[in-house]
Amino acid sequence: MIDALHPVSAAPFSIEAFSCQKAGNARSEYEDAWAIRGSDSPTRCRVAVADGATESSFSALWAALLVESFVRGRSHGPDFFSNLGAIRRLWRRKVRGRRLAWYAAEKARRGAYAAFVGASLNAVNRGWRAVAIGDCCLLHVTGAPSDRALAKAFPLSQSEEFGSSPFLVGSVKKGDDDPLQHVRVSEGVLEENDILLFASDALSAWLLRRNERGEPAWAAVDALRTQEDFEALVAQARDDGTRNDDMTLLRVMRRSVPGAS
């Protein structure tokens, strides 16, 4: 199934979300999460993507809690990761409410982990401010559709940076994995025709690799309209050597706002 949001014409941003699970898996096994939400101002919105670590227990739940907490809040910097107590308690309550075999319960006690990227967007000053931990990425692509170019990739900027063991945000607070020292922050300005892409790690790495080879896939991303389009893009990425993983992509464009410069 495709996950897509098409705001009404008065909304300041056009945002569409596409996602699919690993090849061979059921949709219920999808462990990424994404969220989009307006704010108390009609010219602002917040978006987030998280990638739950398959090796940990109930990571899909943890990823969903992270993105929902971010888009419903006001934090857009490292302070977001200083205030995870409420969703950590909620994760723990939801997990404790399930009947688990002893070995599954033991694994759950170690917690879930996820990579995260989120941003707040302001249509009036055209600014965006993003925060990230791990290898989910924001890609800022500039230029007219016929002449796209990558302006910024955050928090990873080269495909070779993927594949290691990035620090991930945990659902259980531990003294030896304080997330604050791993937080990255970036900001920019969304000009006319620019797009912001928020993607989970495997798709981010492929998009960067294509760009580095001089074979950018921005036109294909521009052309996405349906689930079939996205599945074709994912199949192309996998045929190109991308590992079999959940894939998530948010595509953001700014609409004209009366009074905006």
PLM feature spans:
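Short beta-strand-to-coil "C-cap" segments at the C-terminal boundary of structured domains/repeats
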Residues: 38, 121, 141-144, 251-260
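Hydrophobic, aromatic-enriched interface-forming segments
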Residues: 127-164, 194
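Catalytic core of PPM/PP2C metal-dependent serine/threonine phosphatase domains
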Residues: 79-141, 178-190
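Short helix/loop capping segments that flank catalytic or ligand/cofactor-binding pockets
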Residues: 57-59, 140-142, 206-208, 260
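N-terminal entry segment of metal-dependent catalytic domains or homologous docking segments
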Residues: 1-72, 136, 183-187, 244
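Short glycine- and acidic-rich boundary segments immediately preceding or forming the N-terminal edge
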Residues: 1-33, 87-109, 147-163
